[in-house]
């Protein structure tokens, strides 16, 4: 079910706090370190190896995390135009086809780690709302991945 105009407005209003500081770079890094800690088998698929705590100093992972959070920010900015947002994310999913064995079943766990990292950064975050937003974002991306 699509997000309502009020929900989109609430997401947009909370985004500056979510991405505050370094534009979300640290948030993206926390997302991936949580994800790899809970799903160590995924490190290889994403092109990483070693201990998950050592990854906090990996420049490539830091950049990847920032790129992910930037893309979420773009999706939030486009959420009041669902067709535009879906098109942008669909194209992103298509580009990810060339990055190896990325499958739709990776996204729920990644989303949980994202929500955990967001909630740690922003206590009182509306997790239910952000979970719904993540579903819309990941569904559009997966549609491109599977096209």
UniProtKB/Swiss-Prot annotation:
Keywords: Heme, Iron, Metal-binding, Oxygen transport, Transport. GO terms for molecular function: heme binding; metal ion binding; oxygen binding; oxygen carrier activity. Residues 2-146 form the Globin domain. Heme b binds at residue 96. Gene3D superfamilies: Globins. InterPro entries: Globin (IPR000971), Globin-like_OT (IPR050532), Globin-like_sf (IPR009050), Globin/Proto (IPR012292), Mb-like_M (IPR044399). Belongs to the globin family. Polymer. This protein is one of at least six components in the polymeric fraction of Glycera hemoglobin. This is Globin, polymeric component P2. It comes from Glycera dibranchiata (Bloodworm). The lineage of its organism: Eukaryota, Metazoa, Spiralia, Lophotrochozoa, Annelida.
């Amino acid at each position: 079910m699509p997000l309502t105009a009020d929900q989109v407005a609430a997401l947009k209003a909370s985004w500056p706090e979510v991405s505050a500081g370094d534009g979300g770079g640290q948030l993206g890094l926390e997302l991936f370190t949580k994800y790899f800690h809970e799903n160590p088998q995924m490190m290889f698929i994403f092109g990483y190896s070693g201990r998950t705590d050592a990854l906090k100093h990996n420049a490539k992972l830091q950049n990847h995390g920032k790129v992910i959070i930037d893309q979420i920010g773009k999706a939030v900015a486009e959420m009041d135009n669902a067709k535009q947002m879906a098109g942008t994310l669909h194209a992103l999913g298509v580009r990810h086809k060339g990055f190896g064995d990325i499958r739709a079943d990776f996204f729920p766990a990644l989303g949980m780690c994202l929500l955990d990292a967001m909630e740690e950064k922003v206590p009182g975050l509306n997790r239910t709302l952000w979970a719904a937003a993540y579903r819309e974002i990941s569904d559009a991306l997966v549609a491109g991945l599977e096209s």
